[in-house]
Amino acid sequence: MAGDMMTYETDVVVVGSGPGGSTVARQLARAGQRVMLLEMGRDYRRDILYGSHLGAIVWSDDHGFLFTEEGLTIIRPFMTGGATNMYCGCAALPPVWLKERYGVDLDDWALETVRELQIERLPDDLLGAASRRIMEAGQALGSEWQPLLKFMAPSRAPRFDCGAKCMMGCRCGAKWTANEYMDEAVAAGCTLLTRAGVDEVIIEDGQVGGVRGKLRGRQPFEVRARVVVLSAGGIGTPLILQKSGIAEAGRGLAMDPTVMVYGVSKEAGTAYEPPMTVGCMDDEHGYMLSTLIDPWILYPIMATLKGPSYLLSWRKYRRTIGVMIKVTDEVSGMVSIERRVSKPMTERDRERLHHATVVSRQILVKAGCDPDSIFVSRLRGTHPSATVRLGEMVGNDLQTSVRNLYVCDASVFPEALGLPTVLTIISFAKRLSDYLLRGVLRQEEVRATAATSAASV
């Protein structure tokens, strides 16, 4: 019956199967730990809708219509592998400032992952002709454009077929997703429970005791565990913490606010080229530029949100080139326990966006786009993060104020990354896994053995 509590017991429970959660589950399971991985969504990889426009709507929070109170669109997929199903497969090494300002050195884990997953730039012939024109135009104007590192390998796919549609799920198989680490975790003995929504963490005398939630939205369940790792994302993790009595979670967030600057060329545009193959980072002015365009069906929706007249640009979609602006924003706003998200743009954020927009327009014109065709899309939030910040709400070891309760996802970023986030999250997760295996889990085993011995006396 739906009202009967289902109970489980394990050593470590990991909540969320995105890049953070799947990595922790994989590392710990491979080391022989009893691990249970809980995922709110389902595994859609073999679903007929995977990689389609309709599928992306079906498995996204609020079916793709999740907005901040200020109107920023947020895409938050509920599925195994999390947001890596819908990312562009871009990789960036962890920023140097993590080490310089916060004492967190992720270099070894990042380089290990680069080697393991063969993260590298795409061959020149796969960068895309329009993307190369944008890169050359940017270089001619003084920007340091270059090919970007990718979680994407043509050799993995029977037929390399990447374009704007990659953001809906990779059907050709070239793009790495966290599902692969999840599969490896399960193969190593991890128990995977899908459609398992976690509501709260069990806290007993300042010590974690497990988690509670509902299966399929109605069946109560409880998992008892000695260690809990929350990896439910920049929005999901603070919501769970708030419901568990940790009120400061979600006070302030970063979002890497993003817009596309579109222009129409006489030649083919970027729609049928791999996304974000080239780009540049302007550290001085605080933004990243790359080549990106919304998928065919999403484009008119985003254009209409900008204004009804912009819908007419859809008929020139094949010749449209998109330059993405990702702003390194200041922490502001909040995620509330009622699932409301507020993310106002600060004055500095707006200045950075304005500078990037001017530069992007110049690049598009230099690349041959009609100046009169250029427009800027509606603002959207791409990387909800910094909601459980390292140094404020979690320690250097990612532990919260509750003993053996850890957070490992974009929530722990102490400030906006302003870069592709996945490699940094994986690096944090490998670092945390090593820390748990070296100390915490050994200590818990000793403590459990001692308690059992005392009880038998």
Residue ranges and their predicted role:
Residues 69, 83, 246-358, 362, ...:
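FAD cofactor-binding and catalytic pocket of flavoenzymes
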Residues 33-35, 145, 228:
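Hydrophobic anchor at the start of a short beta-strand
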Residues 2-100, 213, 248-264, 431:
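N-terminal glycine-rich phosphate/pyrophosphate-binding loop and immediately adjacent elements
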Residues 30, 41-45, 200-201, 211-279, ...:
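Glycine-rich loop(s) and the adjacent beta-strand/alpha-helix scaffold that form part
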